[in-house]
Design a protein with these regions (language model features):
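Charged, terminal alpha-helix-loop-beta segments
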Residues: 1-159
Length: 159
């Protein structure tokens, strides 16, 4: 994830505008569909039915690291492998979640479409109820604001 987008996500997660819950960044979605090596990635997911917990990648994360591991070429496992393994358990069945996309600068209408597509892929993988979709950016756009309003996506501006 590019640095600007990562900083934007972190600012949102740490703000009062974000939901409370367990956060994951760069969540692979579509793992249950087609080629196992082909998947999309949603910027962030907050499991709102869980106690508040920062993303595993954050240095001040104090929970269980379920899926994030430093890259280790000898082991050959990546984050998608971690999520695949986690899907095989019932640890996170029936969760309520918020799906988040972030785009630095002015968001594009395409980012809204990507967010909706990522939601459908996530729902195919997990037995989760998506409570809300959020598009985070640092610049307003009248077109994106209109599309978000029409499609029930919350547009959040983070400075």
């Amino acid at each position: 994830m590019p640095g600007d987008r990562r900083a934007l996500l972190e600012a949102f997660i740490r703000s009062d505008a974000s939901p409370d819950g367990k956060w994951w960044l760069d969540v692979p979605v579509g793992l249950s569909i087609g080629d196992p090596d082909t998947y999309a990635t949603v910027d962030a997911v907050c499991l709102t039915s869980r106690d508040p917990e920062l993303p595993e990648e954050f240095p001040d994360h104090d929970g269980v690291p379920y899926v994030y591991r430093e890259v280790d070429p000898e082991i050959g496992l990546d984050k998608a492998d971690g999520f695949r393994a986690l899907r095989g358990t019932d640890t996170f069945d029936g969760e309520s979640v918020v799906v988040v996309a972030a785009e630095s600068g002015a968001s594009s209408v395409g980012a809204v479409g990507d967010l909706l597509a990522h939601q459908k892929l996530l729902e195919a993988d997990w037995d989760w109820t998506v409570e809300e979709r959020v598009l985070v950016s640092d610049t307003d756009s009248d077109h994106v604001t209109h599309v978000c309003r029409e499609l029930s996506v919350r547009a959040v501006r983070v400075a």
